Amino acid sequence: MNYDVVIIGAGPSGIAAGHNIINNKLSCCIIDKQVFPRNKICAGGVTQKTFELLKSLNLGQEFKGENTIVSKSVSIYLKDKYITDIECKGNTYLVDRFEFDEYLVRAYEKKGGKLLENTKIKNIDTENNIITLYDNQNIKFKYIIGADGAVGITRSLVDKDIKPNGFCLQVDVDKINTNYNSDKMSMYYGVLPYGYGWIFPKKNHLSVGFIGEYDKKIDYKC
């Protein structure tokens, strides 16, 4: 297989790049280790500016997620102490990544873009422009885009000595089991070193999580 561009990672950034490439009449293949639709640790806040950018990519049918709601403000907390509300510049769409990424991926495929799901990469040869998959299939490319995150295989092409020490945890909680009735986003600072926590409501559930620098002395499960 030969492509003008191969993209590693089919999240929003990789898929957006793929749409741009297809729109410019170039061949594109996106490789992802997961099968779509799939869940993703993410609060799911998409700004008005981002939605306008996505519309400019000519995605076809407009995204209408069943669990999406619109938020216009975020509440800021220092640990459990309320500090203030901040009004957003435009709407923030609180999306379910299970739905949102599936929409972006299938719109890309409808344009003729190639997607390899459930596919792992064994090696990337940047001298000969060849990607070797674990099934020993080779893919040739002119250009490669790394959109597979901080611990992805393309990161190692830049600096093999980087040792990521950040981590993230998230759980989706049914709204019916809570008294959280607001459409406001909530951000919590001071809950752990070098990080923050969040509660982002969706139509039927709350996305609750935190991200920070890992410290083995802290019992995060408590």
What are the functions of these language-model segments?
Residues M1-V5:
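Extreme N-terminal starter segment of soluble prokaryotic enzymes
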Residues V6, A10, H19-C42:
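Glycine-rich FAD pyrophosphate-binding loop
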Residues G14-I15:
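N-terminal Rossmann-fold NAD(P) dinucleotide-binding loop
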Residues N20, Y103, A107:
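Rossmann-fold NAD(P)-dependent oxidoreductase module
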Residues I41-G44, N91-L94, Y196:
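Glycine-rich phosphate/pyrophosphate-binding beta-alpha loops
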Residues G44-Q48, K163:
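Short, conserved loop/turn and helix-capping segments at secondary-structure boundaries
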Residues T47-Y103:
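A conserved beta-strand/loop capping segment in the N-terminal third of enzymes
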Residues A107-C222:
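Predominantly flavin-linked oxidoreductase catalytic cores and closely associated redox partners
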